[in-house]
UniProtKB/Swiss-Prot annotation:
Gene symbol of the encoding locus: ints3
GO biological process: DNA damage response; DNA repair; mitotic G2/M transition checkpoint; response to ionizing radiation; RNA polymerase II transcription initiation surveillance
InterPro entries linked: HEAT_Ints3_C (IPR056518), INTS3 (IPR045334), INTS3_N (IPR019333)
Keywords: Cytoplasm, DNA damage, DNA repair, Nucleus
Subcellular location: Nucleus; Cytoplasm
UniProt name for this protein: Integrator complex subunit 3
Length: 1017
């Protein structure tokens, strides 16, 4: 089982990398596990190897994980051994493949694009085998793999992945049909991909995709129904394909043939599409880049990011179909938090406007407009979200001045879609658009619509059509001065002033929102109308009618008691009875999902409002965890993990998590705040593994993100526990750190620093801190300063992170350079520090190297002189073409002789009018003389002023009788005066050293000059 050695590659065997990339932590870990595994089995027969591995995994959890990950890595990197490794893996694993599933999920979400081709092929093969074996959790992995199939991409790699995933779904059809979510996600994915596969060469693949989708729609329509209204949008795009047309006709005219429970297309169109489906059609990389633009990029500075995104994802004719996916994602998933509404972050409408204006295909442009208005058509204020309809009105509003054609096109589309979308439902569509416009005004997204609908920049025919369709919104507002003021704002630039006045939501924090999450944000600086919006939803009665009749009588009775009851104590008693019922042996597990839907609806008010008490005391904390939903947590804490009821309650929580994702961070809060849960934080890991995500890291990051969006105080409260309990998930990357520093204020930063200083919180460790600081270079200014302050609160030696200097550019990374500069000035320079400082490329405007060197000349001149001498002589002696290969500690450190001379010359100029005698030191003058003797004429001429210091030193070393003139002794009477660089004592010392170099016969001075003489030789 020993892997064949890598063929002369400096990079790892899993990921594609360059010599400049830092070693990937995940890759290092996996290769280390592979090495351990091969060392155990090396030279053994198959049976002996299996016995040895089995014995090793029995030693403990760590050894079990090492062997599982070692076999997993071997399987990815050694195709000939894959079957054997998988067989061994199934025999030795003790956790239902959980360790492997978690690693696959991590690789798919974080490293898939960097995987070597062989490893990518093997990973797909492994997923196929896991599905064949019916491993619990394989459906989650398969859905993550499907997410990597990019829309609008017909490259060979993407087609290969689409075809292989389809093979798995078709070959394992019976297994697929057991998971309703997998059925829906597969249908959503391949209905979308069919659009991209219309060329002649791809028709065989498209036909297979069509057959697969029709099979799911015919056999499992109600599972497909959970997609919601976007299922109709996707079917419209493929309805011209003959086989699909038959399904489309049945959908419109014979709904009962698809399912007895399906009443008609209106039932589907009034159902909102979950964000899970809208997000599944963006690859993790696309999603990351889009979230970066909507959460980190300032308005007005977006062009270079948009250009990059355009080149990467939207540059081909086929990729135009991706625009509707992006717009649906922005409208339905990327929702702003209250804390950033007044910031200058790039708003959603600006990105959508850019996507519309850069579209090069008429069909794609039409689909993009439909994607933008899709939630308008059947909008119901009681069920749908203002956040989904807001971008369209703001695109039109803000485009009126700079791009009136865009506004006109969208208004025209809005008018014409009413009669043409589906004529039998024209009345419902008109009502939906009317509801949208009315809700927009009610929530003051815009103060008035008349300036938009009756604008003189619109042509007469369009204005007439708008007045005819929407007379209610075309009357002039009162008082007219308000409209005049609003119109005077330069919309294309000063949109944020207008946003504050009109209550716009468009400065997003790029958060993943639940269906109701937009109502629950906890921004403190909000106008009262938004608090009213929250109250409206809180007072809304819970509607559990669709679910409650599916429960058995005992459960139904308790659930109805919960609905009728009002006080918390009664709710808790009933909830305990429900828990007791589901723990009974005869409980029907098929009711779990329905029960979770009821509980999520009944307890939705528990997930609004602040979780953490204003004043934190033992009593207030205990009181805060006395909600009915916390009874599930408490029962879990009281059980042993091997108890059968433990897994049942985890299943209930996992179902609840699908309906209400906020339950994740509520569980974390309970485990920290409740006395009953003391020392039970590991329960969260069991919960994460029980969810559809099946991955602790992903689950934890999503829950902390949800917490960040809802309650920053709670985020800070949880932070010490999360870092201490889950170090492998929190310390290996900067993901959680970025969440924290993105929202904390200066007081919360100081509080976290105190936790670090007292030893309650560790946010960095030596092996990963450098990578995290490098990641932070792309963050905002305050986020970077906060990160550095937290780093400095730790007792990590500066040498650990000094290689970051190689990544810092003086124009792009002033925050990191400032923090490093202040820290370096407190340090005593080591040779490695000096080397890294001098390794920075020389720019006249970049004063970093000169400033720290100058500071060190004042505080540690002797030490600095010795280090510079050693580096100068070492680099001067190196073969010129191989300097970078001889670097002592960092692949990035490419210290060249020319760089050193440039920085020293800059330092010389900086010190020229001071009394600093740094350049009169013997080591410096010896080194300069050594370099001058061997460098070429071009360098001698370029650095002549620097080398002249050594020449003057050489002249002063001659016998007294050969001195030129009496004034040569004048420095004695005016020590340190410019431009003379050295005092009398240093001259004598220098003379003594240099005389050894120039006149070896003077044996009495040999001791002082021996080091230089040896180096020169």
């Amino acid at each position: 089982m020993e892997p064949s050695p890598a063929k002369g590659k400096a990079q790892g065997r899993l990921l594609v990398s360059t010599s400049l990339d830092a070693k990937d932590e995940l890759e290092e870990r996996l290769e280390r596990c592979m090495s351990i595994t091969t060392s155990i089995t090396n030279g053994l027969s198959e049976r002996e190897a299996n016995d040895a591995l089995t014995a090793h995994v029995c030693k403990g959890p760590q050894q079990h994980e090492e062997v599982c990950l070692g076999l997993f890595t071997l399987l990815l990197t050694e195709p000939p051994q894959a079957q054997r490794c998988y067989r061994d893996l199934t025999l030795v694993n003790r956790d239902g493949m959980n360790v492997v599933l978690m690693k696959i999920n991590q690789i798919l979400m974080e490293k898939f694009l960097k995987l070597q081709d062989v490893c990518r092929t093997q990973l797909v093969w492994l997923v196929r085998e896991l599905v064949k074996s019916g491993v619990i959790g394989a459906d989650g992995v398969l859905m993550t793999l499907m997410k990597q199939i990019a829309g609008g991409d017909i490259s060979s790699k993407n087609l290969w992945l689409a075809e292989n995933v389809l093979d798995i779904l078709v070959d394992q059809r019976e297994w697929v049909l057991k998971s309703g979510m997998l059925v829906a996600m597969s249908l959503y994915t391949y209905l979308r991909l069919i659009v991209d596969h219309g060329t002649t060469s791809l028709l065989p693949l498209r036909q297979r995709e069509v057959d697969f989708c029709i099979g799911l729609l015919r056999e499992r329509f109600m599972e497909c129904f959970i997609i919601g209204r976007d299922l109709v949008r996707l079917l419209q795009n493929v309805a011209r394909i003959p086989e699909m047309e038959l399904v489309w006709r049945d959908l419109l005219h014979s709904p009962q043939t698809l399912s007895p429970q399906f009443t008609g297309i209106l039932q589907l169109l009034t159902s909102r599409t979950s964000r899970k489906f809208l997000a599944c059609r963006l690859t993790p990389d696309m999603e990351t880049k889009l979230l970066f633009m909507t959460s980190r990029v300032r308005f007005g500075q977006q062009k270079r990011y948009q250009d990059w995104f355009q080149r990467q994802y939207l540059s081909t004719a086929e990729s135009q179909s991706l625009r509707c996916d992006l717009i649906r994602y922005i409208c339905g998933v990327v929702h702003p938090s209250n804390e950033v509404l007044s910031s200058d972050i790039l708003p959603r409408w600006a990105i959508i406007g850019w996507l519309l204006t850069t579209c090069t295909s008429n069909v794609a442009a039409s689909n993009a407009k439909l994607a933008l208005f899709y939630d308008w058509l059947f909008f119901n204020p009681e069920k749908d979200s203002i956040m989904n309809i807001e971008p369209a009105i703001l695109v039109m509003h803000h485009s009126m001045k700079p791009h009136p054609a865009i506004t006109a096109t969208l208004l025209d589309f809005m008018c014409r879609i009413i009669p043409h979308f589906f004529p039998p439902l024209e009345g419902q569509v008109r009502q939906g658009v009317f509801n949208s416009l009315n809700f927009i005004m009610e929530k003051r997204v815009l103060a008035h619509l008349a300036p938009l609908f009756d604008n003189p920049k619109l042509d007469r025919e369009l204005r007439s059509m708008l007045r005819e369709r929407f007379p209610e919104f075309c009357s002039s507002p009162s008082p007219p001065t308000e409209v005049k003021m609003e119109e005077s704002v330069p919309l294309e630039m000063d949109n944020h002033v207008l946003d504050k006045e009109d209550g716009c939501y468009d400065n997003t924090d790029a958060t993943f929102s639940d269906d109701e999450e937009e109502l629950n944000n906890k921004g403190k600086k909000r106008e009262f109308r938004f608090h009213q919006l929250k109250e409206t939803y809180i007072d809304e009665p819970s509607d559990i009618t669709p679910f409650v009749d599916q429960l058995d009588e005992a459960l139904k009775e308790r659930v109805l008691q919960l609905q009728k009851g009002s006080d918390t104590e009664t709710h808790c008693e009933v909830m305990q009875e429900i828990v007791d019922l589901i723990l009974e042996e005869d409980f029907d597990s098929e009711q779990m999902s329905t029960l979770a839907s009821c509980l999520a609806e009944l307890f939705k008010s528990h997930f609004r409002g602040d979780v953490l008490p204003e004043e934190i005391t033992e009593e207030s904390l205990e009181e805060s965890v006395c909600k009915p939903v916390c009874l599930i947590f408490r029962n879990l804490c009281q059980m042993q993990e091997d108890n059968s009821g433990f897994s049942v309650l985890l299943d209930l929580l996992a179902e609840l998590y699908q309906k209400q994702p906020k339950i994740g961070y509520h569980l974390l809060y309970y485990l920290k705040a409740s006395k009953a849960a003391s020392g039970k934080m590991s329960l969260y890991e069991s919960f994460a593994q029980a969810t559809a995500l099946g991955d602790l890291h992903t689950c934890l990051m999503m829950d902390m993100k949800a917490c960040q969006e809802d309650d920053v105080r709670l985020l800070c409260y949880l932070t010490p526990s999360i870092y201490s309990e889950f170090p492998d998930e929190t310390l290996r990357s900067g993901e959680l750190l970025n969440m924290i520093v993105a929202v904390i204020d200066s007081a919360q930063l100081q509080e976290l620093m105190c936790h670090v200083m007292m030893g309650n919180l560790v946010m960095f460790r030596k092996d990963s801190v450098l990578n995290i600081l490098i990641q932070s270079l792309d963050w905002e200014t305050f986020e970077q300063y906060s990160t550095w302050q937290l780093f400095l609160a730790h007792s990590i030696p500066l040498e650990t992170i000094i290689p970051i200097l190689q990544h810092l550019k003086y124009k792009e990374h002033p925050e990191a350079l400032s923090c490093l500069l202040l820290q370096l000035r407190r340090e005593k320079p080591s040779e490695e520090m000096v080397k890294m400082v001098l390794s920075r490329p020389y720019h006249q405007e970049d004063q970093f190297t000169t400033s720290i060197l100058r500071h060190w000349t004042a505080k540690h001149d002797d030490l600095l002189g010795e280090h510079i001498k050693a580096l100068l002589i070492k680099n001067n002696n190196m073969p010129r073409k191989r300097q970078s290969l001889r670097s002592s500690s960092s692949k990035l450190a490419q210290l060249t002789l020319e760089q050193m001379l440039e920085h020293l010359d800059s330092l010389r100029l900086s010190l020229s009018n001071t009394k600093n005698n740094f350049f009169s030191q013997t080591p410096i003058l010896q080194a300069l003389q050594h370099v001058q003797a061997s460098c070429d004429e071009a360098h001698k001429m370029r650095f002549s002023d620097l080398f002249s210091l050594a020449e003057e030193y050489e002249d002063s070393s001659k016998p007294p009788k050969s001195r030129r003139k009496a004034p040569a002794s004048s420095p004695r009477s005016r020590k340190g005066a410019a431009p003379q660089p050295c005092n009398e004592e240093e001259s004598v010392s220098s003379s003594a050293s240099e005389e050894e170099d120039s006149k070896p016969k003077a044996s009495k001075r040999k001791r002082k000059g021996s080091a230089v003489g040896s180096d020169s030789d």
